[in-house]
């Protein structure tokens, strides 16, 4: 079986992760004690993707929970599905990273990382055919950002040929959780660009907007936001877990979605987003779903896809539907909005269909898009970074942990390069192939 080992790091990662396990367990009919109470063999057919079967028929998640302070772990353990996880897979320190990337990456995190890697090895060894790893974390904190990226680079060394995908919560434009977010996020991107295969970006503000506007929740909590996120994560992995007419796995996704190795930051969307009360009153059709999932209001990341162009995108449908209809809709979207898709990648929309819909819905779609509009996010973070770094504000917290200013400068220029790469491909047309190659050769000669 094609297994995925799931790692959750830091407070944000653990909260998203534990919500994700609630949704996954529910889809597979696993109760909080790990026993199966489902109603269909399909739930068990590929359950190995995320679960290990232990003695007595208990199902245990292939999850590793790590943090530099015990607080979040305790609340996960006390949560509804806390008894599901293997007790040895909780790895935590006592000191906390205090929102300091350097603590997570170089000092506190580096002391804990070996015990995390031991657990990762143990989980990887119990797999038949390990497909890859997924990490949930935030980019603005200390543990998820600093130690999460440290773990990625260590895992990459040890399992170079496995897919590494991350679900990264990026800092929001208006709502800031910590002042040093721009530093932590820029240092994280610096790592993710090199060491991850695909990053699904999420941000709280876009999630709040969805809760307010679409779901009509007046006071959304983090629980509501995480529920949205877990719906999307489950959508990206449904083909691995259930049979379908047209399957899609992490590797296929990476191959189809990443035209250039550095440009692997995706936006995700989910449809149908309806408020909990009005769900059962309307059935959605494939055209409606398609239209909704391409809608910028459904994106879980505060960048507007209309401000850029799609390099590639993938749409995963769930439920019983005709493949012909799906193909027609995909074609329709591209033809109607051709200006939003780069013309030098023909057929850049990939569709996959999984027969089993999520709990409580007849059909749903998950959208993953690699759009140049995501540069808006990086631009915003880079501006905030520069305005603080110019004054060397808060730097002493990082240099005190042994970091060098040079590393900040490198991360900053890497971020700016990323933005200009996105811009370059956004402006590119199919005609200018010749000019492109010359530029590249010049760059190589100069670099």
UniProtKB/Swiss-Prot annotation:
* InterPro entries (alphabetical): Beta-tubulin_BS (IPR013838), Beta_tubulin (IPR002453), Tub_FtsZ_C (IPR008280), Tubulin (IPR000217), Tubulin/FtsZ-like_C (IPR037103), Tubulin/FtsZ_2-layer-sand-dom (IPR018316), Tubulin/FtsZ_GTPase_sf (IPR036525), Tubulin_C (IPR023123)
| Name of encoding gene | TUBB5
* Record's subcellular location: Cytoplasm, Cytoskeleton
Q: Which UniProt keywords apply?
A: Cytoplasm, Cytoskeleton, GTP-binding, Magnesium, Metal-binding, Microtubule, Nucleotide-binding
Species of origin reads: Ectocarpus variabilis
- Quote the subunit structure annotation: Dimer of alpha and beta chains. A typical microtubule is a hollow water-filled tube with an outer diameter of 25 nm and an inner diameter of 15 nM. Alpha-beta heterodimers associate head-to-tail to form protofilaments running lengthwise along the microtubule wall with the beta-tubulin subunit facing the microtubule plus end conferring a structural polarity. Microtubules usually have 13 protofilaments but different protofilament numbers can be found in some organisms and specialized cells.
The miscellaneous comment for this protein is: There are at least four genes coding for beta-tubulin in this organism.
Full protein name: Tubulin beta-5 chain
- Composition-biased stretches, type Acidic residues, lie in 429-447
């Amino acid at each position: 079986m094609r297994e995925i080992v799931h790692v959750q790091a830091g407070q944000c990662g653990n909260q998203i992760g534990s919500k994700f396990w609630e949704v996954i367990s529910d889809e597979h009919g696993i109760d909080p004690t790990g026993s199966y109470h489902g109603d269909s063999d399909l739930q068990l057919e590929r359950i190995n993707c995320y679960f290990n079967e232990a003695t007595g028929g208990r199902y245990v998640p292939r999850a590793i929970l790590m943090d530099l302070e015990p607080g979040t772990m305790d609340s996960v353990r006390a949560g509804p599905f806390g008894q599901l996880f293997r007790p040895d897979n909780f790895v935590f320190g006592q000191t906390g990273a205090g929102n300091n990337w350097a603590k997570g990456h170089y000092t506190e995190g580096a002391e804990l990382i070996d015990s995390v890697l031991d657990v990762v090895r143990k989980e990887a060894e119990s797999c038949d055919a390990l497909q890859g790893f997924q990490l949930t974390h935030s980019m603005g904190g200390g543990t998820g950002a600093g130690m999460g990226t440290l773990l990625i680079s260590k895992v990459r060394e040890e399992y170079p040929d496995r897919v590494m995908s991350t679900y990264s919560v990026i800092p929001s434009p208006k709502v800031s959780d910590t002042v040093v977010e721009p530093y932590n996020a820029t240092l994280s991107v610096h790592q993710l660009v090199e060491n991850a295969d695909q990053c699904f970006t999420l941000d709280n503000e876009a999630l709040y907007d969805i809760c307010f506007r679409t779901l009509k929740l007046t006071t959304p909590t983090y629980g509501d936001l995480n529920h949205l996120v877990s719906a999307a994560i489950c959508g990206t992995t449904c083909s691995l877990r259930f049979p379908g007419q047209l399957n899609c796995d992490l590797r296929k996704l990476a191959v189809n979605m990443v035209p250039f190795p550095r440009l692997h930051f995706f936006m995700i969307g989910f449809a149908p987003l309806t408020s909990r009360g009005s769900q059962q009153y309307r059935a959605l059709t494939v055209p409606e779903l398609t239209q909704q999932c391409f809608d910028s209001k459904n994106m879980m990341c505060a960048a507007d896809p209309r401000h850029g162009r799609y390099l590639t995108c993938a749409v995963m449908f769930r439920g019983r539907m005709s493949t012909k209809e799906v193909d027609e809709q995909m074609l329709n979207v591209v033809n109607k909005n051709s200006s939003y898709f780069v013309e030098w990648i023909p057929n850049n929309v990939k569709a996959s269909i999984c027969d089993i819909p999520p709990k409580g819905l007849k059909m749903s779609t998950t959208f993953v898009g690699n759009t140049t509009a995501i540069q808006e996010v990086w631009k915003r973070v880079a501006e905030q970074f520069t305005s603080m770094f110019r004054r060397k504000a808060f730097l002493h917290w990082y240099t005190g942990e042994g970091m060098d200013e040079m590393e900040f400068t490198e991360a900053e220029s890497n971020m700016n390069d990323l933005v200009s790469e996105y811009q370059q491909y956004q402006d590119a047309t199919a005609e200018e192939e010749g000019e492109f190659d010359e530029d590249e050769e010049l760059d190589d000669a100069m670099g």
